[in-house]
Structure formats: C-alpha cells, structure tokens
Amino acid sequence: MMGKLPLGVVSPYVKMSSGGYTDPLKFYATSYCTAYGREDFKPRVGSHVGTGYKSNFQPVVSCQASLEALDNPARGEQAQDHFQSVASQSYRPLEVPDGKHPLPWSMRQTSSGYGREKPSAGPPTKEVRKVHFDTQEHGPQAITGLEPREVPLLHQQQGQDPLERENFRHGPRFMTSEYNSKYLRDPLDQPDFLQKKSIGAKEGSGFTKQSHQSPIVFQPPSQALPGDPALLPGQSVTKSDFLPKTHLHGDEFLPVLARGSKRETAFSRGNERILNPRVPPPCPEPSSVSHQQFQPLHRMQQTNVALLGRETVGKKEPTGFSLNNPMYVRSPCDPDRDQRYLTTYNQGYFENIPKGLDQEGWTRGGIQPQMPGGYALSQPVSCMEATPNPMESLRHLHPHVGRTLTSADPFYQNTPHSSRCVAHS
C-alpha cells in the first residue's frame, strides 16, 4: 500500500500562484512561471537608448544654428562648423573640376594621392621621356640603349600563328601540310648528270683520317716485355680489363694474407711479394718509350731463403676487420634458433615478437575478458534501468511541483492500466 502523498505547508508564493499549467507541453513548471507568468505575454516595445559605452561619455550640449536662429543668430553662425566629425570633413563627395579653379603656378608640381588636387590628367613630361626618346635633343649616343628607328628583322615582334609562318610568311601552300611546307623540299625532276654531281670513293671522316698511332696504346708484340700483355690497336682495353663473369670451379687458390703488408688492415695493397709464383706479377702500362728506361724492376729478386726453399706460409689469421669484433655469443632470447649471421644490432636489440603458441594472442584458450582501454576508462557502465515509477518520482519532488504535474497530466500519477487512473472529463 502506498502512503498518502505529503501536501506540505502552504507558502506565500503558493497563495500568489495562479495555478498549474493546463498545457501538457509545458512539462517543467517552476516557481517563477507559476507566480509571475502570464499567458500570451508580449513585452513592451521600447526605444533603443544606447550601448554601455554611452554611459561613460560626458554630457555635451550641441549648439546648432537652428536653435539659435531666433535668440542669437550670430552665435548660431559661429557654432555652425564647430560640431563636425572628422569623417565628414575628410570623406567628402567627389568634386569634378568645372574649369573655374585658378591655374597652378608650376606645371611640374608633385601630385598627391587625391584626384582633385592633380593639375592635369595627362602624364608628366618626365614619364613621357622615359618611353619616347627625342634624338634631336639628346642624340643617339646620349642615352644608353636607345633603339634605332628601324628595328632589325630578328628583333621584330613576329606572330606565333603557324599558318602565318608557313612558306616563309607568305601563307600556306595549296594542298600541302604544315610540315611539308616547312621542312621538306620539292624533289627536282632533273637527272643527276645535269646537276654535275659525281660520287667518288668512300673516305674516312675527320675523326679517323687525322688520327695518329698512340705510343701509349700501340705496342708491337716484339717490343713487349716478358710477362706483359701485348697491346694491339684492334684490341679494346675495356674488353681485356672487364671480362665476363665466371663461376668458380673449386681449384682456385684460397685468399691468404700477403707477406709484408700491415696487420691492421685487411687489404693487401701494400704487398711486395706474391706467394704464388704461378700468378704473373701485375705490371703497369708503359706510358712512353722514354719512361720505360727509368722504370724499376718488375720482378722482385728472390732472397736466399726463397732460393733454398725454406720459405713457408703460416696458418690463416684473422684480418683487421675481425680483430675488434666480439666473440660469437648465442643470443639468450632464443638459444635453439640457428643464427648464422649474428650482428651487433641483433645481439643487443633482439626481436620481442612472440613465437609459436605465444603468437596466437587473445585467441588462445577461447574468448578472453576485455581489458579496459584508454577510450573506455572515462565511459560509465551502461546497464538496463528499471521502468521509472511515477509515484516514486513525485515523492522526491516539491509538493507544489507535484500537484502541478498531476493537474496538467492526469496520466502521470498512476500507470495507464491501473484502476485508479480515471481521466478527467
């Protein structure tokens, strides 16, 4: 059983109230609307006095000529131009000269930005002389860049119309194309013997006729040193130096560190002796005949140890590139993984990507509970609320507001299917 609704104490503003609204659209009834509100209220139309800036102005009594016309006409004439705004003085209507203004004292006055103060509408003489030259006054050599009276043909302005430029600017020919009239010549019907033309034997051009044999490139095989390749004119140096790519067969010699080279580098550029005697020593290309007389020996003299056969080659040692490298350490993140190429970056910054079953993520073991993300932290938990009870809502409202709602809407107090719900006739 629901208890009786509290009616409350009658307050002064309830006595002054004109009652609740009968309009069901006015759902929210406030104390101000019930006490002072009137239906069809229309505000009075007033006059616009001014903005808030006007209150800071000093009271100024303007003196106009119409007010002083009867009492003091002389005072009105004196105060006629005193109260005039700066905008009305500066921005006046356009005044066109009627010819009654006096002529200026000097025709070369400096013109201002206003059109009414210009003495004449024509361009000044100084601007005219910059464009039109007077040769009688200055002479052809007085001004640099003075154009002659007749412009050369190449300097004349020519039209870009292709129809005008055809046939040497005589217009296009009849039944001919633009390309044919410009770039193709008409074939002559006369035979060649009438033109007195003769075709001789084919000769070499200027690139090969005046060329001489180069002593740097040409080297007869008889003058070549033993071990040096013979450079013939017909043999290309590019083809001999840049050979095609060949695949290894397995019988090549292993690379070893040359004796006499520096240990801190991996290059054998400073090699003075070649361990393999079967490989011919490299010799530079002779630049000239006179230069060959002062060249050193191409082959190094063998020492006594080499002649006795006591020169041995030691075991292979690491070069300068691998001396400073750390030892090969298998990565602790995945010891079973075969890391053939281990770099410093892979050793320090290993991959943090899960492998195997760990790579499945949330799908492993079924659907996992959703974790709160950054977007869902500030969102409240949404749930299905129960149907609002009108009686419970009326108990928490003001008594006057509750009576206003029940008088305006008789279906608000009880549910529609209740026996107590009786519509007012």
UniProtKB/Swiss-Prot annotation:
Keywords: Cell projection, Cilium, Cytoplasm, Cytoskeleton, Flagellum. InterPro entries: SAXO4. Its main location: other. The keyword Cytoplasm applies. It comes from the Eukaryota. Residues 207-222 have a biased composition (Polar residues). GO terms for molecular function: phosphatase binding. It is found in: Cell projection, Cilium; Cytoplasm; Cytoplasm, Cytoskeleton, Flagellum axoneme. Residues 93-126, 203-225, 316-335 are annotated as: Disordered. Pfam families: PPP1R32 (PF15691). One of its GO terms (cellular component) is sperm flagellum. Microtubule inner protein component of sperm flagellar doublet microtubules. Interacts with PPP1CA. PANTHER family: PROTEIN PHOSPHATASE 1 REGULATORY SUBUNIT 32 (PTHR34349:SF1). This is Stabilizer of axonemal microtubules 4. It comes from Homo sapiens (Human). The lineage of its organism: Eukaryota, Metazoa, Chordata, Craniata, Vertebrata.
